[in-house]
């Protein structure tokens, strides 16, 4: 019985014993390409030539044993990113539990960049939630690079290949979101000028999430309009990127305008970003947010003003604010007036 360390979301511990796969799993997390690389002995770009069911096993998830089918897949390799350099075909094993869990299936014809872990001379999927990420058939790199940078080059190729479908491009952006390097940011900037609206907005949201505000102005008009149904997901991602990533004081003028958006999530993200700047230039915008129709936005304004002006005693907990909202709003409105 040998230990097989697989990443399942954040981590998984697994045991291989006589064809059975026994895993102690945590809930699936976001894709983390750097972690996926670290847990993989081989990374190959290619296409699945065949998949065969080879037996039965057991998967234990959160202390519950679940029966699973064992499969063997044969991968036709286009190029190796990490691992045996001369491989043209690779075989690996994966498991699909009988119960509905977030393991990804693998089928003949599936293509991409596959991440594999070697145990006793056999390859297994490194992460059943993310067995592969986006890649295209052709991608040339003229210089030797660290593995993370090589993976980034592959994702960039997936974004710039004119024959790549939109689903591949969106998958590449999802993977690039977790790579916090300059080459990854540069690749996202290319995607941010894509003729595809879905690709462009997804890339801009990813850039905002890393405090890259060069394209914030290009989505300002969209965020200031009522959200059309098909764009709901895109606007939510943009608002989330602003909330979690933007802290550059140069964004303050646009953030102030976004406080007038008809969409609550956009206003909330803008208020949080103003707070995150930590700049005295954000005070005017936060003062405006004190009058927002949504309590969450008003609370962010109060906390942001307290942090920026270093008045900790007027930065209440959410519970304290809920009980005494009028008291805190009155203080900050009067304070703002006194500064004029």
Language-model features, listed with the residues they occupy:
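Extracellular C-terminal loop/segment signatures of secreted glycoproteins
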Residues: 95-175, 182, 193
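Amphipathic alpha-helical scaffolding segments comprising HEAT/armadillo-like alpha-solenoid repeats
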Residues: 148-160, 181-193, 212-226, 246-260, ...
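Terminal, low-structured helical/coil segments at or just beyond the last alpha-helical repeat
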Residues: 313-340
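Alpha-solenoid repeat junctions
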Residues: 176, 180, 207, 211, ...
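Conserved hydrophobic register position within alpha-solenoid helical repeats
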Residues: 172, 203, 234-239, 270, ...
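Short, conserved beta-turn/loop elements at beta-strand boundaries and strand-helix junctions
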Residues: 51-58, 81-83
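Alpha-helix N-cap/helix-start positions at coil->helix boundaries
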Residues: 164-167, 182, 197-198, 228-233, ...
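OB-fold (S1/OB) nucleic-acid-binding surfaces
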Residues: 62-92
């Amino acid at each position: 019985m040998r230990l097989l360390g697989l990443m399942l979301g954040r981590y998984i511990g697994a045991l291989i014993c006589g064809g059975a796969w026994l895993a102690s799993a945590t809930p699936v997390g976001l894709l983390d390409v750097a972690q996926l690389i670290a847990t993989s002995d081989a990374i190959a770009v290619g296409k699945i030539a065949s998949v065969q069911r080879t037996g039965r096993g057991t998967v234990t998830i959160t202390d519950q044993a679940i029966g699973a089918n064992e499969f063997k897949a044969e991968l036709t390799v286009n190029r190796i990113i990490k691992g045996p350099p001369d491989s043209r075909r690779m075989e690996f094993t994966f498991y699909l539990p009988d119960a509905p869990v977030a393991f990804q299936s693998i089928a003949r014809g599936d293509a991409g960049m596959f991440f594999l872990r070697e145990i006793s001379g056999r390859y297994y999927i490194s992460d059943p939630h993310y067995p592969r990420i986006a890649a295209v058939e052709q991608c040339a790199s003229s210089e030797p690079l660290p593995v993370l940078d090589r993976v980034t080059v592959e994702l960039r190729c997936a974004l710039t290949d004119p024959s790549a479908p939109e689903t591949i491009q969106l998958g590449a952006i999802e993977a690039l979101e977790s790579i916090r390097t300059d080459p990854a940011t540069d690749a996202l900037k290319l995607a941010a000028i894509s003729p595809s609206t879905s690709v462009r907005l997804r890339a801009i949201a990813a850039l905002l999430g890393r405090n890259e505000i060069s394209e914030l102005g290009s989505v300002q008009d969209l965020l200031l309009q009522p959200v059309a149904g098909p764009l709901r997901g895109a606007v939510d991602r943009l608002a989330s990127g602003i909330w979690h990533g933007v802290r550059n004081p140069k964004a303050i003028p646009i953030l102030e305008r976004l406080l007038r958006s008809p969409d609550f999530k956009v206003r909330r993200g803008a208020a949080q970003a103003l707070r995150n700047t930590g700049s005295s230039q954000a005070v005017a915008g936060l003062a405006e947010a004190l009058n927002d129709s949504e309590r969450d936005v008003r609370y962010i304004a109060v906390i942001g003003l307290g942090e920026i002006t270093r008045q900790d005693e007027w930065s209440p907990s959410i519970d304290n604010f809920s009980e005494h909202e009028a008291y805190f709003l009155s203080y900050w409105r009067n304070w703002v007036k006194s500064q004029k």
